[in-house]
Each structure stands twice: as C-alpha cells, then as structure tokens.
Amino acid sequence: MENKELLVKTIKKVYPSHLEAGITWFRFISAINYIKLAKRELELLSYINYRGTISSTSAKQDFCALFDSSIGTVTNMTARLLRIKVLVKEKSKVKVHPALRVDFDKELVIRLHIDTKPNIKTDDADK
C-alpha cells in the first residue's frame, strides 16, 4: 500500500438560519451523490429537516407561506423525494432519511474522504 500525503481543507460557514444551513447541507449531499434536485426540493428538504415532518396540513401550509408554493407542488415534490429515498415514511409521517438528518443546534463537521484509483488497462491483443 502506497503512502499518500494527507491534505486537509477547512471551510467554516455561518448561516443566519437553520433553513439556510439546511439548504446548503442538502445541496452538498445532492452534489456528491449526483442527485439532481430543484431549488424548491432543497427548500422542502431543509424545511422537513428543521420541522421534523411535512405530513400535517399545517406543516404544508407553513411551507407554502414561507416559500410561496402550493400544496400540490409540495405533494408532488414529496412523492418524488420519497421515490428517490431522500425522504422516508416513519409511522405514517414523512421525514428526512435518518442518514441525512442534521441537527443545526449542534456544530456540524463533515469529513469527506476522496481518493482515486487509476484505471487498470488490460492487453486485449493476447485474447
């Protein structure tokens, strides 16, 4: 095993609200996992992460008022996010997948390990 130099990058960001921090978090998660999410879907994920669920009518109405959306749009986005497993149902409540939930009352530190493996080339001429 070859020894590689470890490179550490530190970026510190402060956000004015849990919702804005959540939008950035879900933008990051979607980018590293190649999941294309619309701006409104990022907002919905952030809102659900903060509130806990989007299942109640009052939660949907609150989201619609905050982000100038409609109940139909929330329903369609929720269905899509459930389909791609970013949202899950827990006891009939729609919530953010547990692996993606973040409590922004605590400081968040992310450790991302990125490595590369060179392509192994084979000589097809001998076959």
Predicted segment positions?
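Minor-groove-contacting beta-hairpin "wing" of winged helix-turn-helix DNA-binding domains
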Residues: 92-103
